[in-house]
Each structure stands twice: as C-alpha cells, then as structure tokens.
Design a protein with these regions (language model features):
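Scaffold/interface architecture of coatomer-like assemblies
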Residues: 12-299
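Bacterial N-terminal signal peptides
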Residues: 1-9
Length: 299
C-alpha cells in the first residue's frame, strides 16, 4: 500500500511538473539601441512580454543558443544585375560569420525560385553557391513565391529556429501569391524575416511589356506590403540601401543582430485558446525590441 501511495504521489508530481513546463513559452528577441547596435547583458526585469495586451511573467532570459536554420533569398532578376558583385562579397563574410552551429541554404528568385545550395553547414558548398549567383537580364523577380515556398519548407521540417534573409531590388515581381498568403505562411512557420532592400537600381531593358498583361501596379503593391509588414510582424529587421556597395556592411550588421539575440522564457496561464497577438518591449525607452515566438516542440 505504501508503495502504491508513493507511486501515485510521484505520478502526481510528474504531472504537475509537466503541466508547469507546458505553460512556459519562448521568444527569440533582438534588442537594439537607437543606432541599431545590439544590446548585451540584459536581465529578466528589462523585458515585457504581453499576450493580447496582458503582461506575462518573464521567467528566464539568456543568450539564444538554439541553432538557426537560415535561408538566404537572393534577387537574381534583371533589376539586381548591378548589385550582384556586392551581394556576393557581402554573403561571403555573412555565411562565414554565421555558419558555426547553424545551417544555411541559398535560394535565388530571378525567375521561379531555385534552391542554389541545400541546407548545409559546409562552408565550401556555400562559397561555391555564392560564386554561382548571377543576374538573368530577361527575368523578373518571384520574391513572394520564394518566401511562401521557403516558409512551407520550414513548416514541413518543423525547424525550431528558422530565419529568412532577403536581398532584393525594387524591380518587377511576377509572383503568383498575394501579400496575405505570404504573411500567413511566415507566421505559421514562426520564421523571422529580415529584408535588405536595394533601392535605385535600374535596368531600362526590363519593363512590363516583357511579361504580358500582368497588373504590375497590384503586383508591386503586394510586394511592397510584404517588404513592409513581413519584418515588422515576424520579429525581423528591414534595411534600405541607397547603393549596393553598402550591402556587405548591412549583412555584417545583420549577422551581429542574429548572433546577439536573447531567448526569453515566460509563463502563460493554462488556456485552450491561444493568444492572437504576442508582443515584446523593453522597460527602457531608449531600447527597441523585436521578437518572434519559438515553435513548440511536440510532447
């Protein structure tokens, strides 16, 4: 009888522990100063997590050490032709800095999306792929399609810490997906989306007449919605560059942000209804925070 009672007691304690653990939730958070510099050394009291406007208790804060699964999406349409050399230079340093403990894949979207290098932690394969990045003068971009396909790939693999980095021009986009479809796919896969937008690139030979009767006004509107809302709603960053020569510095800055992220663990009361909105902010007004909820692992 005593053994039976002890077994029940242990079982009850185990169930309580599992229930408590199931109520813990995690966010990956970037904290920046006003000049965009990542901030280190923060503690639980510095963070505020809110679910549907209700503040939750922050339990633990530490450096994010979970491996990242990064997909770098590169514009190889005709509009990006003048930037390709700077993109290659920036990516060489970017992948070298981020490869430790992480995996990267290269995807191009000048024409239909194409996986240039499958997910790997091998620097030689990535360098080889970077060397094969070329612009196609007669191609429009398919950025929105590339984002959806990449997000769905992360969803199928149940990637625990997925990240998308987009390098894109403002050229024509021939995608079949709408902005809402893209944003839904990004949020469903819990993928932080970062954008480096190369502005003022021109290719006078690439015009709407090349691509039939597509409504390019709506196409560009859909693309711009994704570039504006994607980073903001997924805990990412957006950087607009007036010259492609700034690409290496922009990628280096993004690498610094990604390697300086926090893993913030907070408590959520037991509920059958998940919150519609999860937000993170800092108690210090001079700091800004962007974060995305981590995917829950299966029990």
């Amino acid at each position: 009888m005593a053994v039976g009672m002890m077994s029940l007691a242990v079982l009850g304690q185990t169930q309580s522990a599992l229930q408590a653990q199931s109520r813990e939730r995690t966010m990956f958070v970037s904290v920046l100063e006003s000049d965009g510099t990542p901030v280190q050394g923060l503690v639980t009291a510095d963070f505020v997590i809110e679910e549907d406007g209700v503040e939750r208790e922050v339990l633990r804060v530490g450096r994010a050490r979970a491996p990242m699964q990064l997909a770098v999406l590169v514009d190889t349409s005709g509009s990006a032709a003048l930037a390709i050399s700077d993109i290659r230079t920036g990516l060489e340093a970017f992948v070298s800095r981020l490869l430790e403990s992480n995996e990267l894949t290269l995807v191009t979207f000048g024409g239909p999306p194409r996986i240039l290098v499958e997910s790997t932690d091998q620097i030689d394969r990535l360098r080889g792929g970077i060397g094969r990045i070329f612009a196609y003068s007669d191609s429009a971009a398919y950025l929105l399609d590339a984002l959806v396909e990449t997000a769905l790939g992360f969803e199928r693999r149940e990637s625990p810490r997925p990240v998308i980095v987009v390098l894109t021009s403002e050229g024509l986009d021939y995608s079949n997906h709408s902005s809402e479809q893209v944003l839904e796919a990004l949020q469903a896969s819990h993928v932080a989306t970062h954008v480096i937008l190369l502005k003022n690139l021109t290719n006078t030979g690439l015009g709407p007449s090349r691509f039939g009767n597509l409504d390019f006004g709506d196409s560009l509107f859909q693309r711009d919605q994704v570039l504006e809302r994607g980073p903001r709603t997924t805990g990412g960053q957006r950087r607009d560059l007036l010259t492609s020569s700034a690409t290496p510095d922009a990628l280096d800055g993004l690498a610094g942000i990604l390697t300086s992220q926090y893993e913030v663990v907070y408590s959520r009361p037991a509920s059958l209804i998940p919150p519609e909105e999860i937000a993170v902010r800092m108690r210090r007004s001079d700091l800004t925070a962007q974060g995305i909820p981590a995917r829950r692992t299966r029990d």
